[in-house]
């Protein structure tokens, strides 16, 4: 089935791409979660609109990505969360928490979908995450998780 992606789907494509996937994957996963719409001839107009919107929000060049990478790696990120006596957190740190902590620390605004946590952060201390700014550029961000 041909579909038009409305959001970036890892391993499949970016918003505005027209891709061919299995019918069940499209009907049961992508379309109900609004990650994609069915492809139609009239949908080609939607593709252009989605691509224009993506272009505005996308980091345009590798130079821009490297500039943001330098700013990100220079920021000291501290995240205060509730924790128990043994240093274990109540819950875990999510990419959305990391994105808001980066912005609060004076860093650039980062989309939470670009933050890659190796595994959920569930303990206090220093942790390293990466931020995929461009297909060829990733920034390493050190996060210090402290008790609130």
UniProtKB/Swiss-Prot annotation:
Keywords: Ribonucleoprotein, Ribosomal protein, RNA-binding, rRNA-binding. GO terms for cellular component: ribonucleoprotein complex; ribosome. Gene3D superfamilies: Ribosomal protein L9, C-terminal domain (3.10.430.100), Ribosomal protein L9, N-terminal domain (3.40.5.10). The gene is rplI. One of its GO terms (biological process) is translation. Binds to the 23S rRNA. It holds the Pfam family Ribosomal_L9_C. This is Large ribosomal subunit protein bL9. The keyword Ribonucleoprotein applies.
């Amino acid at each position: 089935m041909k579909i038009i992606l409305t959001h970036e789907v890892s391993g499949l494509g970016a918003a505005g791409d027209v891709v061919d996937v299995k019918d069940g994957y499209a009907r049961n996963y992508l379309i109900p979660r609004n990650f994609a719409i069915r492809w139609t001839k009239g949908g080609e107009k939607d593709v252009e609109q989605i691509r224009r919107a993506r272009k505005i929000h996308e980091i345009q060049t590798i130079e821009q990505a490297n500039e943001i990478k330098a700013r990100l790696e220079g920021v000291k990120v501290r995240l205060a969360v509730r924790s128990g006596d043994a240093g274990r957190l109540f819950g875990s740190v999510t990419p959305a928490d990391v994105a808001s902590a980066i912005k609060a620390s004076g860093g650039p605004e980062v989309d939470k979908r670009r933050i890659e946590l190796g595994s959920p952060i569930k303990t206090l201390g220093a942790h390293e995450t990466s931020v995929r700014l461009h297909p060829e550029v990733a920034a390493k961000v050190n996060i210090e998780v402290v008790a609130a």
